[in-house]
Regions:
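Thiamine diphosphate
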Residues: 2-162
Length: 162
């Protein structure tokens, strides 16, 4: 999913809630693109557009999907309601854990899939001719801490003129 920026075209999708139709959009891009297409997508967005996996399997496009699976709505852990809603209610209303096995879901739709357990596994998935799904499992609380550390490092660098 990487490479020199000059060799990559970037597309984005903005559904009604920001997560609608991301896979369908990627299928459209892959239909008109002569090379491989990669999409990085969250687990909840994948659930919202999972029927597109069946459409993808029927088309045989070289679309490589990386699902970041933190078992729910991780974005909400970065927003103010995380600190004002009691933890049990927060998890029910915002965390929305689903317990979905995305590799199994992709396989059920006729796609090849793998769960990445290392960076090398992610690289193998990214290099697998599609349609292919690679799932990376993450932890929401650790993600928040990592984002906080990155934001601090950037703020410190900007403040110090680095």
């Amino acid at each position: 999913f990487g490479g020199p920026l000059g060799t990559r075209r970037v597309f984005s999708n903005r559904g009604a809630n920001g997560i609608d139709g991301v896979i369908a959009t990627a299928i459209g891009v892959a239909t008109e693109h002569s090379g491989p297409v990669g999409v990085v997508i969250g687990d909840v967005a994948t659930l919202h557009d999972s029927s597109s996996l069946a459409a993808l399997a029927r088309r045989g496009l070289d679309l490589r999907i990386l699902v970041v699976d933190n078992d729910g709505g991780g974005i909400f852990h970065h927003l103010p309601q995380k600190t004002v809603v009691d933890p049990r209610s927060f998890e029910l209303l915002y965390g929305t854990p689903h317990g979905t096995d995305f590799a199994m879901l992709a396989t059920a739709h006729g796609l090849t899939a793998r769960v990445a357990r290392s960076r090398d596994d992610v690289q193998v998935g990214a290099g697998t001719t599609g349609p292919h799904v690679t799932v990376v499992k993450t932890d929401r609380e650790r993600d928040v801490a990592a984002h906080r550390d990155m934001h601090k490092a950037v703020a410190d660098a900007l403040r110090d003129g680095r």
